[in-house]
């Protein structure tokens, strides 16, 4: 049974998946940092620090107006559309940052594939000899 588990765990697909999950988690942290530390402050500055997360519609007369969303939920039923707007905006920004990163990676890969392979020195020398011999008349 241990040998069978060893075969399963060390198969290429399982190892590739594990590497992908680990890299994905690390990449997710980078993207989240870009969103929270770079893009959201800019959006906050543009909107004057507007916080959508406290926008809600009270469904109960028990809910006092002007309360933060968390406190309003404790008093009664509310539709918290502000939190939905915040998460939707966050998703759009994450998707855009991911698009920019993947676009940059694709451009780097494209630039890398466009580089012509350098001809090895021995092949270059043989080509020169061939060209010289081709210009000489045959006897």
UniProtKB/Swiss-Prot annotation:
Q: Where found in the cell?
A: Cell inner membrane
- Family annotation (SUPFAM superfamilies): Gated mechanosensitive channel (SSF81330)
Task: Output the Gene3D superfamilies linked to this UniProt entry.
Answer: Large-conductance mechanosensitive channel, MscL, domain 1
Q: Where are the transmembrane segments?
A: 14-34, 38-58, 82-102
Q: Which Pfam families match?
A: MscL
Give Gene Ontology CC terms: plasma membrane
Give this protein's Gene Ontology molecular function annotations: mechanosensitive monoatomic ion channel activity
Write down the superkingdom of origin. Answer: Bacteria
Keywords recorded for this protein, A-Z? Cell inner membrane, Cell membrane, Ion channel, Ion transport, Membrane, Transmembrane, Transmembrane helix, Transport
| This protein's record includes keyword Transmembrane helix | yes
Annotated membrane topology is:
Multi-pass membrane protein
What's the family? Belongs to the MscL family.
Subunit info here reads: Homopentamer.
Q: Tell me, in a sentence or two, what this protein's role is.
A: Channel that opens in response to stretch forces in the membrane lipid bilayer. May participate in the regulation of osmotic pressure changes within the cell.
The protein here is known as Large-conductance mechanosensitive channel
Biological source species: Methylobacterium radiotolerans (strain ATCC 27329 / DSM 1819 / JCM 2831 / NBRC 15690 / NCIMB 10815 / 0-1)
Q: Which gene encodes it?
A: mscL
